[in-house]
A protein has these predicted regions:
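A short tyrosine-centered beta-strand micro-motif
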Residues: 159-163
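Surface-exposed loop/turn positions
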Residues: 82, 157-158
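A glycine-anchored, Pro-Gly-centered beta-turn/N-cap motif
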Residues: 150, 155-157
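Peripheral, solvent-exposed domain-edge segments
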Residues: 2-100, 107-145, 168-236
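Histidine- and/or cysteine-centered catalytic micro-motif in compact active-site loops
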Residues: 151, 164-168
């Protein structure tokens, strides 16, 4: 009886970080440095650090998280070709295995007035570089930030920068409990050549279906290659 309890407790302790570590990408990064604080340039939402589950896949909340608002959010100036990204709050790091993404959507005018209902295109993704059933196989695992370089061909203007990380660690067998974490920063891009004609473009919601293999992949014993969810990284 004591032996069984000890084993159960040990398993629970080992799996606790994967199961309980929630986070939010609410700090803007520019050329490797943090700019502002939490929510200075990232839209605040009502979900705080909690994940969203599959019910959000068909909701407009998939754009920038539940209850996201531009009220009080500033817009940050960057140059095409700069490195930008998002940092986790409270010096947390990504403690779930899974893919990371960045999307852009150009506002028709002032990004503070834009709800993200226009076209989105994926500009960056990070999938497994090793086994998708091991945390060490995911480059985003253990990182404090996700960052990428803005294409130099972008059109000048104001954009929503959507960062997303998807935790697949709760998927077991036929049970799909993937976790979506997403936030939107407001940026103003200048200095681009303006020659970009992004393809493909997508609407959000519309980038996923609830049963996409890349969302439902069984981290605890899945077989075969991992298929990245969502559209391809856009050609610019």
């Amino acid at each position: 009886m004591v032996k069984a309890f000890t084993l159960t407790a040990a398993v629970a302790l080992l799996s606790a970080p994967l199961a309980s570590a929630h986070y939010i990408l609410n700090i803007l990064m520019h050329n490797g440095k943090q700019v502002g604080g939490e929510y200075t340039y990232v839209r605040k939402n009502s979900n705080t650090y909690m994940p969203s589950f599959m019910e959000i896949i068909d909701s407009k909340d998939l754009r920038c998280n539940k209850g996201a608002t531009s009220a009080g959010t500033k817009t940050y100036d960057v140059k095409a070709g700069d490195k930008v990204g998002l940092k986790l709050f409270n010096n947390e790091f990504i403690e779930h295995p899974g893919p990371g993404f960045f999307y852009l959507s150009k506002a028709p005018g002032n990004v503070s007035d834009y709800d993200g209902s226009g076209d989105w295109f994926k500009v960056w993704e990070s999938g497994p570089t090793g086994s998708p059933t091991s945390t060490s196989g995911w480059p985003t695992y253990g990182k404090y930030t996700m960052e990428f370089t803005l294409p130099t061909t972008l059109q000048d203007g104001e954009y929503l920068l959507r960062g997303e990380h998807i935790g697949i660690h709760e998927n077991r067998g036929s049970l799909s409990l993937y976790l979506n974490y997403m936030e939107c920063a407001q940026i103003r891009i200048s200095g681009g050549t303006g020659t970009a004609n992004p393809s493909p473009v997508s609407k959000i919601p519309g980038i996923y279906s609830k049963t996409d293999p890349g969302l439902t992949f069984n981290f605890w014993g899945g077989k075969g290659a991992y298929v990245m969810p969502g559209p391809a990284v856009a050609k610019l």
